[in-house]
Structure formats: structure tokens, C-alpha cells
């Protein structure tokens, strides 16, 4: 059973990385909008799942916070995307669907740990892409990123705190 849990958590970790959010790549406004939308769709959905399924109150609280704040972020992003004439999809990307399916299989505190790990990794990637957007030459996206970075950092801190309470990452 322990091996199965480690394999599932490894799959979660692999599904959460965002290699395209590196700082050495020139800023792509459309790419930022699309990637942020995809992440927000998944975070809203996973947040609701965690709010309902979390074993610990901290997991349910983190899920509720992410569900609410990422929903607000996504609504603001959609408005911005419409002004920029960027069509945003309404469905999550395949790896986020796989992440959800993997999390659905996990019981109790194993779910809590997997969710916390996935959120730490996702929010690390979001922080990197939002920093890049905040430093970009696009004034609207820079303002959007600067406005939302504090919320993302708070969410990341809560997820990291929860992960630490649950024994930390199995990879550290």
C-alpha cells in the first residue's frame, strides 16, 4: 500500500510541474493568459474537492480559500482576456484532469498530503509566471499579476504549512 501511495504522489508531482513558466523565456502575454486560466480552472475544481473531501480542517480551509480566490482570479482574467481578444477554454488541460483523477483515488490524510503537494507545486509555478508577467511590458497584465501575486503567495504559504504538518513532501 505504501508503494502505491508513493507512486500516486509521484504521478501527482509530475503532473503539477510547469516548465514553460521559467524566467529565461521571453514573456508571452497570450501564453500567460491561457496557462493561468488552465491553472485557475483546475485549482477551483480541486479546491472544491478538498473543501469537501479533506480529512483535516486545514485541508478543507485551504480548499475553500483556493476555490474562492482562484474563482475570483479567473473571472478577472476572463474579463482581461476579452479586452485583449484572447479566447480562453472552459475545460482543464489533460494533465490537470489526470491530477484530479489521481487525487480522487487517495484516501483520508493521503488525499490531504497529495492535495497539499500538488498545490505547493502549482502555486510555485504560478508565482514564477506571475512574477514574469508583473515585470512585462504589458501594463494590463503587469497590473493584474501585481494585484494577484500576494494572494498566490498566501495560498502557497498555507499549502506549504499543511504539507509540513502532514510530514512534508515524500521527495525531500
Where in this protein do the model-derived segments appear?
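Sec-dependent bacterial lipoprotein signal peptides
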Residues: 1-14
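His/Met- and acidic-residue-enriched segments that coordinate or traffic transition-metal cofactors
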Residues: 16-172
Amino acid at each position: 500500500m505504501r508503494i502505491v501511495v508513493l507512486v500516486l504522489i509521484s504521478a501527482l508531482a509530475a503532473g503539477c510541474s510547469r516548465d514553460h513558466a521559467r524566467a529565461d523565456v521571453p514573456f508571452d502575454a497570450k501564453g500567460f493568459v491561457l496557462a493561468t486560466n488552465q491553472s485557475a480552472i483546475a485549482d477551483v475544481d480541486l479546491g472544491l474537492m478538498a473543501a469537501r473531501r479533506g480529512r483535516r480542517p486545514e485541508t478543507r480551509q485551504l480548499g475553500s480559500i483556493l476555490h474562492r480566490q482562484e474563482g475570483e482570479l479567473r473571472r478577472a482574467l476572463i474579463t482581461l482576456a476579452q479586452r485583449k481578444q484572447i479566447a480562453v477554454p472552459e475545460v482543464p488541460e489533460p494533465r490537470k484532469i489526470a491530477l484530479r483523477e489521481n487525487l480522487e483515488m487517495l484516501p483520508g490524510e493521503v488525499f490531504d498530503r497529495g492535495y497539499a503537494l500538488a498545490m505547493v507545486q502549482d502555486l510555485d509555478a504560478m508565482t514564477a509566471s506571475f512574477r514574469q508577467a508583473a515585470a512585462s511590458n504589458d501594463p494590463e497584465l503587469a497590473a493584474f499579476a501585481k494585484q494577484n501575486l500576494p494572494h498566490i503567495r498566501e495560498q502557497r504559504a498555507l499549502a506549504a504549512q499543511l504539507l509540513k504538518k502532514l510530514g512534508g513532501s515524500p521527495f525531500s
